[in-house]
Swiss-Prot record:
The gene is BCAM. Residues 569-628 are cytoplasmic. It comes from Bos taurus. Epinephrine-stimulated phosphorylation of Ser-621 by PKA enhances adhesion to laminin. Ser-621 can also be phosphorylated by AKT1. The modification Phosphoserine is found at residues 596, 598, 600, 621. Its main location: membrane. Residues 254-355, 355-441, 448-538 form the Ig-like C2-type domain. This is Basal cell adhesion molecule. CDD domains: Ig. Residues 613-628 have a biased composition (Gly residues). Gene3D superfamilies: Immunoglobulins. It is found in: Cell membrane.
Amino acid sequence: MEPPDARAGARRAPRLLVLALLLAAPPGSKAEVRLSVPPLVEVMRGESVTLDCSPLGTHDYFMLEWFLVDRSGARHRLASAELRGSELRDKELNSRGRSPPYQLDSQGRLVLPEAQVGDERDYVCVVKAGAAGTAEATARLKVFAKPEAPEVSPNKGILSVMDDFAQEIATCSSRNGNPAPQIMWYRNGQPLAVPLEVNSEGYMTTRTVREASGLLSLTSTLYLRLHKPDREASFHCSVHYYLPAGQHGRLDGPSFSLTLHYPTEHVLFWLGSQSTAEGWVREGDSVQLLCQGDGSPTPEYTFFWLQDKQEDVLKTSLEGNLTLERVQRNQSGTYGCRVEDFDVPEDAELSKTLELRVAYLDSLELSAGEELSLPLHNSTTVTCSARGLPTPTLYWTKDSAPMGEDPTLSLHSVTFDSAGTYTCEAYMPRIPLLSRTRSFRLLVQGTPELKAKETQPKAEGSWTEGDEVTLICYARGYPKPKLTWSQLGGSPTEPAPGGQGWVSSSLTLKVTSALSQDGVSCEASNPLGNTHHVFHFGTVAPQTSQAGVAVMAVAISVALLLLVVAVFYCMRRKGRPGCCQWGEKGSPPPGEPKLSHSGSQRPEQTGLLMGSASGGAKHGSGGFGDEC
């Protein structure tokens, strides 16, 4: 086995040869080798990167070496090789514990698989080309890592706006980035320009930590002096990081708000229940009084009722509401709310008052009772009285038809048309759903008024005896009239369709000649009198005899039947000699024997009888005998 020193000497032999060639170069010759090496190479963490080192021009032979420059400036060889023509020989690699190890490709370029933050160094490429000389160039590797999304820890406590110094708002952290990212703070979407120097208005502090992986984590804490408008502000932080080729990225953290302590400055006091603009509520309703101050935390509220300039405390609570159940008219007055906030100056006015007006409307009173009887053509007045607050408006209706706005109803020379239901209604235009009504019924006394429904005859101009007719009478009055007829069969008196006090009765009968003389009368009566109407029928035509018409119809029907039978028989015997032919004087055809029957029997009948008696003697399709 060959000793190690011998093998090392064999490897050094070509290098010594190259060195000898370089030393043997003619004096005065100019050696020049130029390299193409990118001064800065950028890569994302975890990606593979290749560092190029290419001599410019044509060189049949050169020696290539790659060095790593540490933080102290010392060089450490990573790889070496010789290039003869296009063939790379005698490669040597020293990974210095890197995993995965460095690689050298076929063109002498240094390959770093899965770039890490620790690979951020200067890499020196040295080329020795014999007589052409020696050259070296440095490539700086920059490794970028996208940081994790920011995590925010807001201050969960209650922050006072009355403090005159900046308070801690929140802390924002971003981990594992490279190079170190930047953290910015925002309020309502607008960036906060806060310095790093401590002051009373606002500043921020930052801290950077290098993790074991070589990545950087950044933490920023925001301090601000708070004001009352910040109670509705939205805060968040964002991380700005760098990418290759001058690009930038941004990651936003979740937004948050703060819980602030600030004194009450304004108080609102209003009616929460349905009410008018003037503060009117209906008697019997439940009324809610609402009070709200703009301080935080929620202050204490005191509700009171002013009576003779003295406060009658009704309730003290944190809810800011007071409910008055089923308010009455004597609860009208001035109500107030006061905010008990001990953080405000003593001279601050933190109370409000409002006027509560309870609207009421008592039952209506009429000068007439529920029913008013008045003789026909008499006159009277009815007065409607209402008591309420605010003053109600009165108007009258008759059977739901409006009559006008006036507390007094005047009835002049009443007729039966005046009878009906009169209603007085009181309402308040400014207060919805507050109204009352009171009604009375007017009864007009008098002899009944009668109206008949005339009928017209069926035949134009006159009635015919036996025609059926229905007669109808209508009547109205008070007391209620009764309808009777001069003939039996009238229907009972019933209210007529359409109302208005009318009643009706009907009678159905047949017209006779006796009715044409006397007619039919209808009478309406009540204790005050009666009225009647007579239905006249005029001339009544006698009825046509129905028996003669029936006999004539039967005779015509029989004659038509015999004619049809004769025609049918002749058509069946058409073409036979002597058939269906008679002499001029009605004698039988020649050659036929004379019948010994009575002379009243006709030949056609004889022929039919003979044919029928012949039984099975059939010829042709007729089915009758051969005799005519």
